[in-house]
Each structure stands twice: as C-alpha cells, then as structure tokens.
C-alpha cells in the first residue's frame, strides 16, 4: 500500500503473513519520507521597508520555506510463532527502526541553510522471545526482551 501526502510526503507499507496448524508469521515493512519543505509566513521575523532616506515606512512578515524538516524512516517488524499443538507456544518478535530526521532551524535564523546541518539519526532493535504454556484452567508464560538503540545528533554550522 502506498500513501502520498502534502509536501511530497510518501508512505509505503507492505505486510506478508503465513500461517498453518503450527506456524504463524507476519512481516511488516513501513517506509516514510518527506522533504517537508512547506512555505509559511514567519511571524517571528519582521522585515522593515525603508524609503530612500532610510526611514521605516512599513513592515511585513516574510514568507519563507521550512528548512531542515526532511525525514526518512524505515520500520521492519517480524513476528514468528510456533504452536506445538500440546499447549506450548513459542514466539519471536523483532522490530528494527532506521530513522534519519533533520531538525528545524530557528525561525529567526538568518544563516544560509546550505551551511547548516542539524540532524538526528537513530537505529534501534527490539526483540522479544516468549513461551506460553496453556491448559484448560490456567496459563503460564515467560518473556525476555532486548533493546539496543544507537542515536546520533549531527550539528554543523
């Protein structure tokens, strides 16, 4: 499935599933991206209008383009379950995130946006192993998880 939104925003989604008497599997992939470079009236920045004698004769709020708002995000989710048919169910859930997001400049920044980088990058893995033992009147289960996140903040002027 694909979604298209304003400011050249694109979202892609894919899901694959499989299941039989013992095995169930689901794989999902999501990718979102956007330059996110919309125009807006910057009410934090007032520009003066001068006459030839340098007297202020008016002012206005400039229309600017959002700078450093782009993003690219990818998520992959994998779920696998095995049912023994005798009351035991084993599971594996894994989720991976790869994110690259620009962080917006200050709305009063007069610098050249080509000389500026303000970005957050992230890679995260989350995994869970599980075991459930089910009987007619009771259930017991054990889950164990692991999370690893790498994150970086890049700033260059």
Report each predicted region and the residues it spans.
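Structured loop/turn residues at secondary-structure junctions
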Residues: 4-5, 19, 134
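Soluble oligomerization/assembly scaffold segments of membrane-associated complexes
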Residues: 41-42
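Transmembrane beta-strand segments of Gram-negative outer membrane beta-barrel proteins
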Residues: 1-4, 25, 29, 140
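Flexible loop and strand-edge segments within Gram-negative outer membrane beta-barrel domains
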Residues: 38, 67-73, 87-136, 140, ...
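Transmembrane beta-barrel wall of Gram-negative outer-membrane proteins
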Residues: 8-33, 45-100, 123-125, 129
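Small/polar loops that bind or transfer phosphate-bearing groups
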Residues: 4, 15, 143
């Amino acid at each position: 499935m694909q979604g298209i939104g304003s400011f050249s925003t694109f979202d892609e989604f894919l899901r694959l599933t499989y299941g039989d008497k013992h095995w169930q599997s689901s794989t999902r992939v999501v990718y979102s991206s956007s330059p996110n470079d919309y125009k807006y009236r910057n009410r934090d920045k007032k520009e003066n209008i001068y006459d030839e004698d340098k007297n202020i004769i008016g002012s206005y709020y400039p229309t600017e383009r959002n700078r450093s708002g782009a993003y690219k995000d990818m998520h992959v989710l994998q779920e696998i379950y095995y049912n023994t048919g005798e009351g035991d169910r084993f599971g594996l859930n894994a989720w991976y995130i790869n994110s690259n997001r620009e962080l917006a400049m200050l709305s009063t920044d007069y610098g050249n946006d080509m000389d500026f980088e303000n970005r957050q990058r992230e890679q995260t893995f989350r995994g869970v192993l599980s075991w459930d033992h089910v009987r007619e009147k009771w259930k017991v289960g054990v889950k164990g998880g692991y999370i690893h996140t790498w994150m970086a903040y890049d700033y260059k002027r």
